[in-house]
Structures are given as structure tokens and as C-alpha cells.
Regions:
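Long C-terminal interaction/binding lobes of large macromolecular proteins
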Residues: 68-167, 178-179, 184-187
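Histidine- and/or cysteine-centered catalytic micro-motif in compact active-site loops
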Residues: 47-49, 75-76, 190
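Extended interfacial segments that mediate partner engagement and assembly in macromolecular machines
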Residues: 1-65
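N-terminal J-domain/J-like co-chaperone modules of DnaJ/Hsp40 proteins
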Residues: 163-213, 217, 223-243
Length: 243
């Protein structure tokens, strides 16, 4: 298991414990089993390796038969598309879109902090518009069931878990601008974007505005603004105060 995944697992457990919802819990590396005070049981997997449709069905079948709700959370940098991508779903994504109300979950790590967020697969068919949601509120963890009737391979009623309301695919609630809004704007991002979105935007803008590649006389100044915004946002995600 990667060190970052260990950090994410530790952060996940502590965050759920802090809600007061957990009665008992057990962890085994990237797998975390919680019994909630509501009586529900949730098994969360932090996924850092390729997951096949057969793997998904195995976990869903085994856990559902035991009355345990399953939640997969994926290493975002490796497995999940960037925000606003128009993306042809891989087989495992399409399978989870079918059973999880067109929602995946991702995690990112910065320093000793970890961040968990939904990834919405907007649209219909195999090609979807990707939309990263706001960071999850651990107090909203819940179990629910999803019945699949139209897909023979996935047919059945599955015990699942997620954050927020049972119907996840909805726009995030409006909120006031944060003090970091101007730095997100420099990178061409909406306020409070995810760390993954920040990294992707920085890489794209660095390729476009780096003085070694861009002959524009203002490229050096623009690149300095981009670097400053990126460093301040990273400092925020890592839990330090930027100067």
C-alpha cells in the first residue's frame, strides 16, 4: 500500500470517528469496516490499483449477502478524469455508474492531509461530462440500496454507501467566495476546486505560458502569477498558511 493511501485511510477513519456516528471499526490497510450507531455497516475500499468489473461484482455480491454496504473511493490522480473532461467511460466506470447513481468517489493527498470528493458522470451513454463535487461531509455518510434491472451482468439489488443525499448527481450548493478565490481564478478555476483540478490546471497553464515556450513579452509575468497562485493553493491544501 502506498504511503499516501495510508495517510488517506488514517484521515478517513479519524474524520468518521469525529462525527460520533461510529460504534465500532476495523481497518486492514486500504479496507475499512465501520459499524455505525444506526446499525448500518459500511465497508470502504481505497482503490490504488486497476479494478475490473469482475472485482466490483465480487465485492458487491459478497458484501450485500452479508448485509454490508460497499463504498469504493479511487486514487484520483491515477484513475479519475479531470473536471470538465468529456470522457469515454472505461468498463469499470460504466459498471459503477450503473449501480451508483452516476457517481464515483475520489481521494487526493497533500502532505498529511487527505481530501475526499464525489465525481459526477453527467449525461447518458458511454461518453460523459466529468464534474468534480465539493469535499464530502463525513456526517452525511449513509447506506442505501440500488436495484439494477436493465443490465444482465449487474442485475440485482446492491447494498451501497455514499455521502450527501441518496441522489448524488446534483450541482453543489452555492456558497460565498473564499479568500483563495482570486488564486483559483488565476488558474482559470471556480472557487474551491479540488486539488486534482488545481494540479491539472497548473500543468496546462505552465505548458502554455512558460517563457521558454511562449514568446509573448508578458509571459514571464504571467508565469510568475501562475506559480504564486499554485504555491498558495498547495499551501492551503497542505494545511499551512501561505505568506
Amino acid at each position: 500500500m502506498r504511503y499516501d493511501t495510508f495517510v488517506a485511510a488514517e484521515h478517513y477513519v479519524l474524520s468518521l470517528q469525529a462525527t460520533g456516528m461510529v460504534e465500532t471499526w476495523y481497518t486492514d490497510g486500504d479496507m475499512m469496516h465501520f459499524k455505525l450507531k444506526s446499525g448500518e455497516e459500511v465497508l470502504t475500499y481505497l482503490i490504488e490499483y486497476p479494478l475490473s468489473v469482475q472485482n466490483i461484482l465480487h465485492h458487491l455480491t459478497t458484501n450485500t449477502q452479508k448485509g454490508i454496504s460497499t463504498l469504493f473511493i479511487f486514487w484520483a490522480d491515477m484513475f479519475l478524469p479531470a473536471h470538465d473532461d468529456l470522457y469515454p467511460l472505461e468498463d469499470w466506470m460504466e459498471a459503477l455508474a450503473t449501480v451508483q447513481e452516476n457517481t464515483l468517489y475520489g481521494f487526493e493527498v497533500a502532505g498529511r492531509n487527505a481530501f475526499f470528493f464525489p465525481v459526477y458522470l453527467d449525461g447518458v451513454g458511454r461518453v460523459r461530462r466529468i464534474r468534480h463535487g465539493e469535499l464530502v461531509d463525513f456526517r452525511t455518510l449513509h447506506a442505501y440500496s440500488s436495484e439494477v434491472k436493465h443490465d444482465d451482468a449487474l442485475r440485482g439489488r446492491w447494498a451501497l454507501a455514499g455521502f450527501g443525499t441518496p441522489t448524488q448527481a446534483r450541482p453543489p450548493a452555492p456558497r460565498k467566495a473564499t479568500p483563495l478565490a482570486k488564486f483559483y481564478a488565476v488558474l482559470g478555476l471556480p472557487d474551491a476546486s479540488t486539488l486534482l483540478a488545481v494540479k491539472v490546471a497548473y500543468r496546462q497553464m505552465a505548458r502554455e505560458y512558460h517563457p521558454d515556450r511562449n514568446p509573448d513579452p508578458h509571459a514571464h509575468q504571467r508565469m510568475a502569477q501562475i506559480n504564486d497562485a499554485y504555491e498558495r493553493l498547495l499551501a492551503y491544501y497542505e494545511g499551512y498558511d501561505a505568506p
